[in-house]
Amino acid sequence: MKARRLALWMGAALALHAATAAGDPVSHSAYERETIDAALEQTGGAIDPSPDGKQIESIEIITLEVIEERDPVPGFFNVFHATTLKSVIRGELLFDEGEKYDARLVQESARNLRKRRQLSLVLLVPLRGSSPDKVRMLVITKDVWSLRLNTNVQIYEGKLLTLLLQPAEENMFGTHKMLGGLFILEPDTYSFGGQYMDRRVAGSRLQAVVSANLIVNRETGSPEGSFGTLFYGQPQYAVETKWSWKAMVVWYDEIFRSYVGTDLRRYDSPATPGDDRIPYVYDAARWFSAYSVTRSFGRELKHDVSTGVEIDRRRFRLRDAQSFAPAAVRDFTRQELPVTDTRVSPFLQLRSYTSHYHRVHDFETLGLEEDFRLGHEAVVRVYPASSEVASTRDMLGTHAALGYTLPFGSGIARAVAASTIEKSTRAATDATLQLGTRVVTPRVGFGRFVYDGLLISHYENYLNDQLTVGGDGRLRGYAPKQFIGKDVLASNLEFRTRPVQVWSVQVGGAVFYDTADAFDGFSDVRMKHGTGIGLRSVFPQAERIVFRADYGVPVTDKGFTFPGSLFIAFGQAFGMPTLPAPSLETDYRE
């Protein structure tokens, strides 16, 4: 179930101080330094330590093959891959020959390229020019395998929870257009479909995504739902882009099933004498569409004004309700089943943020450059709804969020806070408070500490939204999604080692201590604890995302609870906190 939602949001995502100031020194990983040294030898160039203000006399692009000489795989396999065209790389650069070198435009160009799924390594290096007042720009990129089987897998205690396979040509003819299929295997269903993505429609800045998928019951072989995404628009592709817009639709129509590990989650009503064992199985449908336009002001200090309209339709119904005691069904519906609701809302949004970034290594990936925005980010949105215009409720929605990020040596510190209130009648008001924090220390010996804290409180829960925590994320050692509630509190500490390069593969380790709980009201909090070790690896030939294997054991008053559990998946157990979106989709992400 989560994989379908993940694939859906991936479709929408596909659809959808100054440590980086001029003159600041740039550090590189051993893998990146090795790449730069080879490129300098190839071009016969030397790095220019002070390129600012000099005229760019040439732009030289080196596109590395997926399989290089330093890799243990024969280079013959490169014939099955379409290397990115140099014209595609050049089209993403925000500077040109004859212009003055501007560090901010160079860095923004690098960030734009790193967003591309088809590229794992991106390096922009200024070289000494033919005279002291000129500079050559060296652009180095490395493709990931284009004809590929994208995979996401979740394994718990040796049992397959989710398998996602996405056979795709992600770089058709070297143009970064993607055509692919999708297959998701879950305990009770499998899903299949297709998707197409064009980041530069007809050579323009317009982007388009189309994705549609069918859900089939594994036991009966009958279709039981669908999900997909449609997106068309022009994103804010550069700091100085003034206008952006989008039109998008996201939908799913499914039989929702909630699991604890590999077993169906079940509900027991306190109002009945026996164990009701009502399974968390219900019809769930959601259709969301958004149409908006944004005007952006400023360069270093940005202010975006957005307006548009959103339509959000939610439908939920318990299956086989007649098979259970009426009192238990009423309790389940009131306490656990999401509420059917329709909202049609025009909105006005103001967003303020800086265009300063901190360039780092070994945060969310290994051995590759990463960029995190520094300074403040603030969002305020107002969105009314009326029952006279197809909405279920008369309400006034407000969303306010604030985040701040500081460099911490080679680390970073970030805090975010957000409040969403949909004010209606007392019984129909929905309100959420979310707090998050992340501290990544500078390197300590052979690694760095990462602390992450999270609080989500649905203190008014008209929509009956439910959250889970477990071994698939912030509470390793327990069953995936083992605990459920409207509120979540989590505190996670990891020590992540510096990666070791094995050929070109980046390999690192982790030691962690987790404490978390999902609960209904703070009087119900019972924090659970877990600890363990993990393995992280990144294959630059395939992906920037880490592959992780975490072995954890619960920690109780009596000590460690063995045998514990092993969980295998892609991506870190918890991501860098960001401002929560006020709706299903508010920005286009590659």
Model segments located where?
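Periplasmic polypeptide-binding modules associated with outer-membrane biogenesis and secretion
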Residues: G23-L160, L165-E169, H176, G180-D198, ...
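Outer-envelope beta-barrel architecture signal
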Residues: G53-Q55, V135, W145-L149, L161, ...
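Transmembrane beta-barrel wall of Gram-negative outer-membrane proteins
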Residues: G194-L318, T333
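Feature captures outer-membrane beta-barrel proteins of Gram-negative bacteria and organelles
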Residues: L163-M172, Y190-A208, G228-Q236, S289-R295, ...
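Outer-membrane beta-barrel pore domains and translocons
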Residues: I62, Q154-Y156, A168-E170, L182-E186, ...
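Outer-membrane beta-barrel translocator domains and adjoining extracellular loop/strand segments
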Residues: S191-M197, T220-F227, K246, F256-R266, ...
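C-terminal transmembrane beta-barrel domains of outer membrane proteins
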Residues: L93, E377-E590
